[in-house]
Amino acid sequence: MGQKINPLGFRLGTTQKHHSFWFAQPKNYSEGLQEDKKIRDCIKNYIQKNRKKGSNRKIESDSSSEVITHNRKMDSGSSSEVITHIEIQKEIDTIHVIIHIGFPNLLKKKGAIEELEKDLQKEINSVNQRFNISIEKVKEPYRQPNILAEYIAFQLKNRVSFRKAMKKAIELTKKADIRGVKVKIAGRLGGKEIARAESIKKGRLPLQTIRAKIDYCCYPIRTIYGVLGVKIWIFVDEE
């Protein structure tokens, strides 16, 4: 029986790279991993805490003239909706944190970075190390599976049909520089008692080709009927 491996880990070292860059003694390695998790969780919690409740942001779709009203009200299940990934680089006295984000409006506010650095300093409680945080805006947000998954989550929470939500998400990738995309949703779709899985695919998706650059994410969506699982594969290019 065939086993499904994570597409990102399968390509680590070829088309995918590590998100943490540091060296440590073997006995201190576990502490470094726990520290990385604390840093990432602290950043996600900061964004969730400082998000204005009920404020709306309009995102103009690249694929059509449709303007999507994107509700910024957050719940406990979607604290990192606009962060694609966080890179951590550790030196002797400095921890460099690079936040790759699709819509960095919140972190562009005056004093936001300084406040986040103070929160991280308290969380890690490291006297000899200081934090250096930088923000990198993703050039093509709808080329990122995390952002597409969050968009689908927003649609489903607003009682939009799951098939319509998947089709709209694929439409957003039309003008992005990609060669294939697949969206899969599993769970009690439409409130049915029996769980099932539905998927839509467009273009190529060579999962067994290691040199193929494929982005992937798995995203849980909490609804009144239970938790739905969204998986998105995006075939960017082939090296």
From Swiss-Prot:
It comes from the Eukaryota. Its main location: plastid. Keywords: Chloroplast, Plastid, Ribonucleoprotein, Ribosomal protein, RNA-binding, rRNA-binding. Residues 43-139 form the KH type-2 domain. GO terms for biological process: translation. InterPro entries: KH_dom-like_a/b, KH_sf_prok-type, Ribosomal_S3_C_sf, Ribosomal_uS3_bac-typ, Ribosomal_uS3_C, Ribosomal_uS3_CS. Gene3D superfamilies: 3.30.300.20, Ribosomal protein S3, C-terminal domain. Residues 50-74 are annotated as: Disordered. It is found in: Plastid, Chloroplast. NCBIfam families: rpsC_bact. Part of the 30S ribosomal subunit. Belongs to the universal ribosomal protein uS3 family. This is Small ribosomal subunit protein uS3c.
